[in-house]
Design a protein with these regions (language model features):
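Substrate/ligand-engaging "lid" and interaction regions
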Residues: 1-42, 46-461
Length: 461
Protein backbone atom coordinates (compact mmCIF):
# COMPACT_ATOMS: atom_id res chain seq x y z
CA UNK A 1 0.00 0.00 0.00
CA UNK A 2 1.23 3.44 -0.95
CA UNK A 3 0.07 6.94 -0.04
CA UNK A 4 -1.42 7.91 -3.37
CA UNK A 5 -4.92 8.96 -4.35
CA UNK A 6 -5.02 6.13 -6.87
CA UNK A 7 -4.19 3.57 -4.17
CA UNK A 8 -6.99 4.77 -1.89
CA UNK A 9 -9.52 3.48 -4.41
CA UNK A 10 -8.69 -0.09 -3.41
CA UNK A 11 -10.47 0.18 -0.08
CA UNK A 12 -10.33 -3.52 0.73
CA UNK A 13 -6.56 -3.58 1.24
CA UNK A 14 -6.73 -0.63 3.63
CA UNK A 15 -9.64 -2.17 5.55
CA UNK A 16 -7.72 -5.44 5.84
CA UNK A 17 -4.80 -3.51 7.37
CA UNK A 18 -7.25 -1.70 9.69
CA UNK A 19 -6.32 1.68 8.28
CA UNK A 20 -9.14 4.25 8.13
CA UNK A 21 -9.52 6.35 4.99
CA UNK A 22 -10.92 9.86 4.42
CA UNK A 23 -14.72 9.72 4.24
CA UNK A 24 -15.13 12.58 1.79
CA UNK A 25 -14.49 13.36 -1.86
CA UNK A 26 -10.90 14.63 -1.93
CA UNK A 27 -11.15 15.95 -5.46
CA UNK A 28 -14.26 17.96 -4.63
CA UNK A 29 -12.52 19.27 -1.50
CA UNK A 30 -9.49 20.35 -3.53
CA UNK A 31 -11.64 22.13 -6.10
CA UNK A 32 -13.64 23.95 -3.43
CA UNK A 33 -10.45 24.99 -1.63
CA UNK A 34 -8.95 26.22 -4.88
CA UNK A 35 -11.95 28.51 -5.41
CA UNK A 36 -12.61 29.51 -1.81
CA UNK A 37 -9.53 29.05 0.38
CA UNK A 38 -10.26 29.42 4.10
CA UNK A 39 -7.28 28.05 6.00
CA UNK A 40 -3.55 28.23 5.30
CA UNK A 41 -1.05 26.64 7.67
CA UNK A 42 2.65 27.56 7.84
CA UNK A 43 4.91 24.76 9.08
CA UNK A 44 4.68 21.28 7.54
CA UNK A 45 6.07 19.28 10.46
CA UNK A 46 4.75 16.33 12.45
CA UNK A 47 2.58 18.27 14.89
CA UNK A 48 0.67 19.81 11.99
CA UNK A 49 -0.07 16.46 10.35
CA UNK A 50 -0.99 14.80 13.65
CA UNK A 51 -3.22 17.55 15.04
CA UNK A 52 -4.59 20.46 12.93
CA UNK A 53 -4.77 18.33 9.77
CA UNK A 54 -6.58 15.59 11.67
CA UNK A 55 -9.01 18.11 13.17
CA UNK A 56 -9.99 19.39 9.73
CA UNK A 57 -10.36 15.84 8.47
CA UNK A 58 -12.95 15.16 11.17
CA UNK A 59 -14.95 18.20 10.01
CA UNK A 60 -14.68 17.10 6.38
CA UNK A 61 -15.70 13.54 7.23
CA UNK A 62 -18.81 14.82 9.00
CA UNK A 63 -19.71 17.28 6.25
CA UNK A 64 -19.28 20.28 8.54
CA UNK A 65 -16.62 21.87 6.32
CA UNK A 66 -16.07 21.64 2.57
CA UNK A 67 -12.57 23.08 2.21
CA UNK A 68 -9.25 21.62 3.27
CA UNK A 69 -6.01 23.12 4.53
CA UNK A 70 -3.33 24.61 2.32
CA UNK A 71 0.02 23.82 3.92
CA UNK A 72 2.99 26.13 3.30
CA UNK A 73 6.58 25.46 4.36
CA UNK A 74 9.00 28.36 4.72
CA UNK A 75 12.02 26.82 6.41
CA UNK A 76 12.74 23.55 4.60
CA UNK A 77 11.34 23.40 1.08
CA UNK A 78 12.44 19.78 0.66
CA UNK A 79 9.67 18.67 3.04
CA UNK A 80 7.12 19.74 0.43
CA UNK A 81 9.05 18.52 -2.58
CA UNK A 82 10.18 15.17 -1.18
CA UNK A 83 7.57 14.20 1.41
CA UNK A 84 4.27 15.88 0.55
CA UNK A 85 3.88 16.12 -3.22
CA UNK A 86 5.20 12.63 -4.12
CA UNK A 87 2.43 11.23 -1.88
CA UNK A 88 -0.42 13.43 -3.11
CA UNK A 89 -0.27 15.42 0.16
CA UNK A 90 -1.42 12.35 2.09
CA UNK A 91 0.06 11.10 5.35
CA UNK A 92 -0.61 8.31 7.81
CA UNK A 93 -1.42 9.16 11.43
CA UNK A 94 -0.63 6.41 13.92
CA UNK A 95 -2.25 7.09 17.29
CA UNK A 96 -0.58 5.15 20.10
CA UNK A 97 -3.14 4.50 22.82
CA UNK A 98 -2.22 3.63 26.39
CA UNK A 99 -4.50 0.57 26.40
CA UNK A 100 -2.28 -1.06 23.79
CA UNK A 101 -4.42 -0.43 20.74
CA UNK A 102 -3.15 1.46 17.72
CA UNK A 103 -5.35 3.58 15.49
CA UNK A 104 -4.19 4.13 11.91
CA UNK A 105 -5.72 6.85 9.75
CA UNK A 106 -4.85 8.23 6.33
CA UNK A 107 -5.00 12.02 6.62
CA UNK A 108 -6.31 13.55 3.40
CA UNK A 109 -7.46 16.99 4.52
CA UNK A 110 -4.68 18.86 2.71
CA UNK A 111 -5.82 20.50 -0.50
CA UNK A 112 -2.37 21.54 -1.68
CA UNK A 113 1.20 22.06 -0.48
CA UNK A 114 3.36 25.09 -1.25
CA UNK A 115 6.83 26.39 -0.54
CA UNK A 116 7.06 29.91 0.87
CA UNK A 117 9.70 30.67 -1.71
CA UNK A 118 9.56 34.04 -3.44
CA UNK A 119 11.84 32.66 -6.14
CA UNK A 120 9.42 29.85 -6.99
CA UNK A 121 7.04 31.82 -9.18
CA UNK A 122 4.25 29.23 -9.25
CA UNK A 123 4.11 28.73 -5.48
CA UNK A 124 4.59 32.40 -4.62
CA UNK A 125 1.89 33.54 -7.04
CA UNK A 126 -0.48 30.92 -5.65
CA UNK A 127 0.16 32.20 -2.12
CA UNK A 128 -0.55 35.74 -3.29
CA UNK A 129 -3.77 34.54 -4.90
CA UNK A 130 -4.79 32.86 -1.64
CA UNK A 131 -3.95 35.88 0.51
CA UNK A 132 -5.93 38.13 -1.83
CA UNK A 133 -9.05 35.98 -1.40
CA UNK A 134 -11.85 37.40 0.75
CA UNK A 135 -12.74 33.86 1.82
CA UNK A 136 -9.42 33.33 3.64
CA UNK A 137 -10.24 33.24 7.35
CA UNK A 138 -7.15 32.08 9.17
CA UNK A 139 -3.45 31.47 8.78
CA UNK A 140 -2.07 29.20 11.48
CA UNK A 141 1.54 28.48 12.42
CA UNK A 142 3.68 25.71 13.89
CA UNK A 143 7.13 27.10 13.13
CA UNK A 144 8.58 26.79 16.68
CA UNK A 145 9.14 29.70 19.04
CA UNK A 146 12.42 30.50 17.29
CA UNK A 147 10.50 31.07 14.08
CA UNK A 148 9.08 34.32 15.44
CA UNK A 149 12.45 35.73 16.50
CA UNK A 150 13.74 38.57 14.34
CA UNK A 151 16.43 39.87 16.70
CA UNK A 152 19.92 38.83 17.78
CA UNK A 153 20.70 38.01 21.43
CA UNK A 154 21.65 41.67 21.97
CA UNK A 155 18.16 42.78 20.94
CA UNK A 156 19.16 44.28 17.59
CA UNK A 157 17.38 43.24 14.42
CA UNK A 158 19.15 40.44 12.55
CA UNK A 159 20.97 41.30 9.33
CA UNK A 160 18.46 39.48 7.13
CA UNK A 161 15.59 41.31 8.82
CA UNK A 162 17.24 44.71 8.32
CA UNK A 163 17.85 43.79 4.69
CA UNK A 164 14.13 43.05 4.30
CA UNK A 165 13.24 46.38 5.91
CA UNK A 166 15.23 48.13 3.21
CA UNK A 167 14.15 45.86 0.37
CA UNK A 168 10.43 46.25 1.01
CA UNK A 169 7.61 43.71 0.68
CA UNK A 170 8.27 42.92 -2.99
CA UNK A 171 11.78 41.66 -2.20
CA UNK A 172 11.52 40.22 1.32
CA UNK A 173 13.38 36.95 1.84
CA UNK A 174 13.20 36.15 5.57
CA UNK A 175 10.41 33.88 6.85
CA UNK A 176 8.42 36.54 8.71
CA UNK A 177 9.33 39.07 6.03
CA UNK A 178 7.59 36.95 3.41
CA UNK A 179 4.58 36.52 5.69
CA UNK A 180 4.42 40.30 6.20
CA UNK A 181 4.71 40.75 2.43
CA UNK A 182 1.73 38.45 1.87
CA UNK A 183 -0.24 40.40 4.48
CA UNK A 184 0.65 43.61 2.67
CA UNK A 185 -0.54 42.09 -0.58
CA UNK A 186 -3.86 41.26 1.11
CA UNK A 187 -4.06 44.86 2.32
CA UNK A 188 -3.52 46.23 -1.19
CA UNK A 189 -6.15 43.86 -2.62
CA UNK A 190 -9.00 45.12 -0.45
CA UNK A 191 -7.73 44.75 3.12
CA UNK A 192 -10.07 41.88 4.03
CA UNK A 193 -9.90 40.76 7.68
CA UNK A 194 -7.73 37.83 8.73
CA UNK A 195 -6.67 35.89 11.83
CA UNK A 196 -2.98 34.99 12.19
CA UNK A 197 -2.98 32.14 14.71
CA UNK A 198 0.19 30.83 16.30
CA UNK A 199 -0.37 27.38 17.75
CA UNK A 200 3.24 26.86 18.72
CA UNK A 201 3.93 25.62 22.23
CA UNK A 202 5.02 28.88 23.84
CA UNK A 203 3.35 31.36 26.18
CA UNK A 204 1.67 34.43 24.68
CA UNK A 205 2.38 33.05 21.21
CA UNK A 206 -0.01 35.49 19.55
CA UNK A 207 1.96 38.43 20.93
CA UNK A 208 5.21 36.95 19.63
CA UNK A 209 3.75 36.65 16.14
CA UNK A 210 2.25 40.14 16.30
CA UNK A 211 5.53 41.72 17.42
CA UNK A 212 7.38 40.14 14.51
CA UNK A 213 4.87 41.11 11.81
CA UNK A 214 4.34 44.57 13.32
CA UNK A 215 8.08 45.30 13.15
CA UNK A 216 7.98 44.85 9.37
CA UNK A 217 4.82 46.93 9.03
CA UNK A 218 6.40 49.77 11.01
CA UNK A 219 9.67 49.68 9.08
CA UNK A 220 8.01 49.56 5.67
CA UNK A 221 5.51 52.33 6.38
CA UNK A 222 8.18 54.54 7.94
CA UNK A 223 10.60 54.21 5.02
CA UNK A 224 7.94 54.48 2.34
CA UNK A 225 8.10 50.88 1.18
CA UNK A 226 4.44 50.37 2.11
CA UNK A 227 1.35 52.54 2.30
CA UNK A 228 0.75 54.21 5.69
CA UNK A 229 -2.54 52.39 6.10
CA UNK A 230 -0.78 49.02 6.26
CA UNK A 231 0.42 49.63 9.82
CA UNK A 232 -3.10 50.58 10.88
CA UNK A 233 -4.38 47.40 9.23
CA UNK A 234 -1.94 45.17 11.12
CA UNK A 235 -2.53 46.94 14.44
CA UNK A 236 -6.34 46.89 14.21
CA UNK A 237 -7.63 43.61 15.74
CA UNK A 238 -10.92 44.09 13.91
CA UNK A 239 -8.90 43.69 10.72
CA UNK A 240 -5.96 41.44 11.64
CA UNK A 241 -6.07 39.46 14.87
CA UNK A 242 -3.30 37.53 16.61
CA UNK A 243 -5.12 35.13 18.96
CA UNK A 244 -3.29 33.40 21.79
CA UNK A 245 -3.46 29.63 22.01
CA UNK A 246 -2.37 26.67 24.11
CA UNK A 247 -1.49 23.39 22.40
CA UNK A 248 -0.66 20.08 24.04
CA UNK A 249 0.10 16.91 22.09
CA UNK A 250 3.28 14.86 21.86
CA UNK A 251 4.40 13.73 18.40
CA UNK A 252 7.82 12.07 18.68
CA UNK A 253 10.13 11.37 15.75
CA UNK A 254 8.90 8.36 13.68
CA UNK A 255 9.59 5.24 15.73
CA UNK A 256 11.25 2.07 14.41
CA UNK A 257 8.73 -0.25 16.10
CA UNK A 258 5.84 1.65 14.52
CA UNK A 259 7.61 1.47 11.16
CA UNK A 260 7.89 -2.33 11.44
CA UNK A 261 4.27 -2.69 12.50
CA UNK A 262 3.15 -0.75 9.43
CA UNK A 263 5.39 -2.79 7.14
CA UNK A 264 3.98 -6.02 8.58
CA UNK A 265 0.50 -4.72 7.76
CA UNK A 266 1.48 -4.16 4.14
CA UNK A 267 2.08 -0.41 4.25
CA UNK A 268 5.25 0.20 2.26
CA UNK A 269 5.77 3.99 2.52
CA UNK A 270 7.68 3.94 5.79
CA UNK A 271 11.17 5.21 5.02
CA UNK A 272 12.15 8.49 6.65
CA UNK A 273 13.55 11.28 4.54
CA UNK A 274 16.40 13.37 5.91
CA UNK A 275 16.63 16.71 4.14
CA UNK A 276 19.77 18.71 3.55
CA UNK A 277 18.72 20.83 6.54
CA UNK A 278 18.67 17.66 8.65
CA UNK A 279 14.88 17.57 8.98
CA UNK A 280 13.53 14.08 9.62
CA UNK A 281 10.19 13.43 7.96
CA UNK A 282 8.40 10.17 7.24
CA UNK A 283 5.16 9.37 5.41
CA UNK A 284 3.70 8.45 8.80
CA UNK A 285 3.58 10.33 12.07
CA UNK A 286 3.16 8.64 15.47
CA UNK A 287 1.43 10.53 18.26
CA UNK A 288 -0.21 10.12 21.63
CA UNK A 289 -4.00 10.06 21.85
CA UNK A 290 -4.38 12.92 24.35
CA UNK A 291 -4.57 16.36 22.80
CA UNK A 292 -5.64 19.86 23.77
CA UNK A 293 -5.99 23.01 21.72
CA UNK A 294 -7.38 26.14 23.36
CA UNK A 295 -7.63 29.27 21.21
CA UNK A 296 -8.67 32.84 21.91
CA UNK A 297 -11.88 33.34 19.97
CA UNK A 298 -10.77 36.35 17.92
CA UNK A 299 -11.46 35.73 14.23
CA UNK A 300 -12.53 38.89 12.36
CA UNK A 301 -13.34 37.00 9.14
CA UNK A 302 -14.91 33.89 10.66
CA UNK A 303 -13.27 30.50 11.18
CA UNK A 304 -13.73 26.77 10.61
CA UNK A 305 -16.09 25.13 13.12
CA UNK A 306 -13.22 23.49 14.98
CA UNK A 307 -15.18 23.33 18.22
CA UNK A 308 -16.87 20.31 16.61
CA UNK A 309 -13.47 18.61 16.57
CA UNK A 310 -12.66 19.32 20.23
CA UNK A 311 -10.94 22.71 20.02
CA UNK A 312 -11.89 25.02 22.89
CA UNK A 313 -12.51 28.66 21.98
CA UNK A 314 -12.45 31.11 24.85
CA UNK A 315 -11.09 34.44 26.09
CA UNK A 316 -7.45 35.50 26.09
CA UNK A 317 -7.46 35.48 29.89
CA UNK A 318 -8.64 31.87 29.96
CA UNK A 319 -6.03 30.79 27.41
CA UNK A 320 -3.36 32.25 29.69
CA UNK A 321 -4.81 30.40 32.68
CA UNK A 322 -4.79 27.09 30.81
CA UNK A 323 -1.19 27.70 29.75
CA UNK A 324 -0.16 28.56 33.30
CA UNK A 325 -1.95 25.49 34.66
CA UNK A 326 -0.10 23.22 32.23
CA UNK A 327 3.34 24.83 32.33
CA UNK A 328 3.57 25.63 36.04
CA UNK A 329 1.74 22.72 37.65
CA UNK A 330 0.00 19.95 35.76
CA UNK A 331 2.36 18.77 33.00
CA UNK A 332 5.69 20.47 32.43
CA UNK A 333 7.04 20.28 36.01
CA UNK A 334 6.23 16.57 36.10
CA UNK A 335 7.94 16.02 32.75
CA UNK A 336 11.04 17.90 33.91
CA UNK A 337 11.23 15.94 37.16
CA UNK A 338 11.07 12.65 35.27
CA UNK A 339 13.52 13.87 32.64
CA UNK A 340 16.20 14.88 35.14
CA UNK A 341 15.98 11.75 37.27
CA UNK A 342 15.40 9.52 34.26
CA UNK A 343 18.74 10.63 32.81
CA UNK A 344 20.48 10.21 36.15
CA UNK A 345 19.08 6.72 36.67
CA UNK A 346 19.75 5.49 33.15
CA UNK A 347 16.22 5.33 31.77
CA UNK A 348 15.71 5.74 28.03
CA UNK A 349 11.89 5.76 27.98
CA UNK A 350 9.67 8.02 30.05
CA UNK A 351 7.05 5.28 30.33
CA UNK A 352 9.53 2.92 32.01
CA UNK A 353 10.07 5.47 34.77
CA UNK A 354 6.45 5.05 35.81
CA UNK A 355 7.30 1.47 36.85
CA UNK A 356 9.64 2.90 39.50
CA UNK A 357 7.63 3.46 42.69
CA UNK A 358 10.00 6.17 43.94
CA UNK A 359 9.74 8.20 40.72
CA UNK A 360 5.96 7.80 40.72
CA UNK A 361 5.88 9.13 44.28
CA UNK A 362 8.13 12.04 43.24
CA UNK A 363 5.80 13.29 40.50
CA UNK A 364 2.61 12.54 42.43
CA UNK A 365 3.73 14.69 45.34
CA UNK A 366 5.01 17.48 43.06
CA UNK A 367 1.70 17.50 41.20
CA UNK A 368 -0.99 16.75 43.75
CA UNK A 369 0.50 17.79 47.10
CA UNK A 370 2.87 20.66 46.28
CA UNK A 371 1.40 21.98 43.02
CA UNK A 372 -2.40 21.76 43.22
CA UNK A 373 -2.77 24.00 46.32
CA UNK A 374 -1.57 26.98 44.24
CA UNK A 375 -2.63 25.88 40.74
CA UNK A 376 -4.25 28.35 38.37
CA UNK A 377 -7.73 26.95 37.64
CA UNK A 378 -8.88 28.02 34.15
CA UNK A 379 -12.45 26.84 34.67
CA UNK A 380 -12.75 25.07 31.31
CA UNK A 381 -10.38 22.25 32.34
CA UNK A 382 -10.01 20.52 35.70
CA UNK A 383 -6.40 20.72 36.97
CA UNK A 384 -6.76 17.51 38.99
CA UNK A 385 -8.24 15.56 36.07
CA UNK A 386 -5.45 16.91 33.87
CA UNK A 387 -2.80 15.56 36.26
CA UNK A 388 -4.74 12.29 36.55
CA UNK A 389 -4.54 11.86 32.78
CA UNK A 390 -0.85 12.78 32.67
CA UNK A 391 0.20 10.36 35.41
CA UNK A 392 -2.25 7.52 34.79
CA UNK A 393 -2.53 7.49 30.99
CA UNK A 394 -0.12 9.74 29.10
CA UNK A 395 3.26 9.25 30.76
CA UNK A 396 2.87 5.49 31.48
CA UNK A 397 1.90 4.79 27.84
CA UNK A 398 4.49 2.14 26.81
CA UNK A 399 3.77 2.73 23.14
CA UNK A 400 4.92 6.34 23.21
CA UNK A 401 8.61 6.42 22.26
CA UNK A 402 9.38 9.51 24.34
CA UNK A 403 12.63 9.85 26.23
CA UNK A 404 13.90 11.69 29.31
CA UNK A 405 16.88 12.78 27.20
CA UNK A 406 14.60 14.68 24.79
CA UNK A 407 12.64 16.37 27.55
CA UNK A 408 15.79 17.29 29.49
CA UNK A 409 17.00 19.55 26.68
CA UNK A 410 17.22 23.23 27.73
CA UNK A 411 16.17 22.44 31.31
CA UNK A 412 18.23 25.37 32.62
CA UNK A 413 15.88 27.69 30.74
CA UNK A 414 12.77 25.90 32.00
CA UNK A 415 13.31 25.53 35.74
CA UNK A 416 12.29 29.07 36.69
CA UNK A 417 8.87 28.98 35.02
CA UNK A 418 8.12 25.32 35.73
CA UNK A 419 8.86 25.51 39.45
CA UNK A 420 9.54 29.15 40.31
CA UNK A 421 5.91 30.24 39.99
CA UNK A 422 4.80 27.63 42.52
CA UNK A 423 7.57 28.67 44.91
CA UNK A 424 6.53 32.33 44.57
CA UNK A 425 2.90 31.44 45.30
CA UNK A 426 3.96 29.67 48.48
CA UNK A 427 6.08 32.65 49.53
CA UNK A 428 3.18 35.03 48.96
CA UNK A 429 0.66 32.87 50.83
CA UNK A 430 -0.31 33.49 54.43
CA UNK A 431 -1.54 29.90 54.73
CA UNK A 432 1.23 27.93 53.03
CA UNK A 433 4.84 27.53 54.17
CA UNK A 434 7.43 27.54 51.41
CA UNK A 435 9.69 25.50 53.69
CA UNK A 436 7.18 22.65 53.46
CA UNK A 437 8.21 22.06 49.83
CA UNK A 438 10.45 19.00 49.68
CA UNK A 439 10.17 17.42 46.25
CA UNK A 440 10.31 20.54 44.09
CA UNK A 441 13.71 21.37 45.66
CA UNK A 442 14.71 17.76 44.94
CA UNK A 443 14.32 18.46 41.23
CA UNK A 444 16.64 21.46 41.53
CA UNK A 445 19.16 19.29 43.36
CA UNK A 446 18.80 16.60 40.71
CA UNK A 447 19.50 19.15 38.00
CA UNK A 448 22.69 20.24 39.76
CA UNK A 449 23.74 16.59 39.86
CA UNK A 450 22.83 16.21 36.16
CA UNK A 451 25.20 19.08 35.31
CA UNK A 452 28.12 16.90 36.39
CA UNK A 453 27.53 15.08 33.11
CA UNK A 454 27.24 11.50 34.32
CA UNK A 455 24.51 9.19 35.56
CA UNK A 456 24.59 7.72 39.07
CA UNK A 457 26.36 4.68 37.61
CA UNK A 458 29.03 6.88 36.02
CA UNK A 459 27.82 6.65 32.41
CA UNK A 460 28.20 9.96 30.51
CA UNK A 461 24.85 11.69 29.97
Amino acid sequence: MHLLDSELKNKEQWEKAEISLPQFDRQAMKEETKKNPQWVHFGAGNIFRAFPAALQQKLLNEGIEKTGIIVAEGYDYEIIKKAYRPQDDLSLLVTLKANGTIEKTVIGSLAESLTVDRHDAADWNRLKEIFASNTLQMVSFTITEKGYSITSPDGAFRADVKADFEAGPENADSYIGKLAALCYWRYTQGAAPLALVSIDNCSHNGDKLFAAVDAYAKAWTENGKAEKGFLEYIENPAKVSFPWSMIDKITPRPDASVKKMLEDAGFTDTESIVTSKNTYVAPFVNAEEAQYLVIENAFPNGRPALENAGVMFTSRETVEKVERMKVCTCLNPLHTALAVYGCLLGYTKISDEMKDADLVKLVEIIGYKEGLPVVTDPGILSPKKFIDEVLQIRVPNPFMPDTPQRIACDTSQKLSIRFGETIKEYMASSELDVKSLKFIPMVQAGWCRYLLGASVSGVPI
